[in-house]
A protein has these predicted regions:
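Recognition helix of helix-turn-helix DNA-binding domains
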Residues: 152-192
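N-terminal regulatory/sensing modules of transcriptional regulators
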Residues: 1-126
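Hydrophobic "lid"/C-terminal helical patch
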Residues: 117, 147, 190
Length: 200
């Protein structure tokens, strides 16, 4: 199996490349840490599976989901596996919705990683493990993050150029989707789902 690995942390990338090759199931693993190098390599060589991180802030202005979309626009048949430490339901759903073949946590053992890659190669995925989540819109995410930071609602409405009544409607929609009834519950649920990072 030939793998293209894109991760912005060199130590992790180089170490994983070495371990994958040592697994004997992977015949070739090409590691890149910059977006330009990734797309050049992707176009020039053929790979069975592409391993892609979500957080690529040290290597690209885009995140892994955006890179995933670019990959599939170039070659819709590409098998892309998201390999990330962000093991949250909302990220898993987004990954599969955008066409990822699998979503794997970086904390898994090498044995499990290889087995999951074998499954991907055989066109098998883990869709049945993805919970049914009603995804928030981009505007709802902005509002959720603002209220969780403690921003005054009047200020939030002004910044978004909407009335306070419209803002309250958005907030109620957010609560309904998250199945919560107040800001504290919304904050805890948002962290669990991956919409926001903990404040501490």
């Amino acid at each position: 199996m030939k793998i293209l690995l894109f991760d912005d942390h060199r130590l992790f990338g180089e170490s994983l490349k070495k371990l994958l090759i040592e697994s004997q199931f992977v015949s070739f693993c090409y590691y890149v840490e910059k977006e330009n190098d990734f797309f050049r390599t992707f176009r020039e060589k053929e790979f069975d599976i592409i391993l892609l991180d979500i957080n690529l802030k040290n290597s690209s202005e885009k995140n892994g989901f955006e890179i995933l979309a670019d990959i599939l626009s170039i070659n819709p048949d590409s098998k892309v596996v998201i390999l990330s430490s962000y093991d949250m339901p909302i990220y898993k759903k987004m990954a599969f919705d955008k066409g990822a073949a699998d979503f794997i946590n970086k904390s898994v053992s090498m044995e499990e990683l290889v087995e999951r890659l074998k499954r991907v190669l055989c066109n098998k995925t883990y869709y049945n493990k993805i919970p049914n989540i009603e995804v928030l819109t981009e505007r709802e995410i902005v509002i959720l993050r603002a209220i969780c930071k403690g921003d005054v609602k009047k200020k939030i409405a002004k910044n978004l150029f909407i009335s306070e009544r419209t803002l309250y409607n958005h907030i109620q929609n957010i609560y309904d989707k998250l199945e919560v009834s107040n800001t504290v519950e919304a904050y805890n649920k948002a962290i669990k789902l991956g919409y926001i990072e903990p404040l501490m």
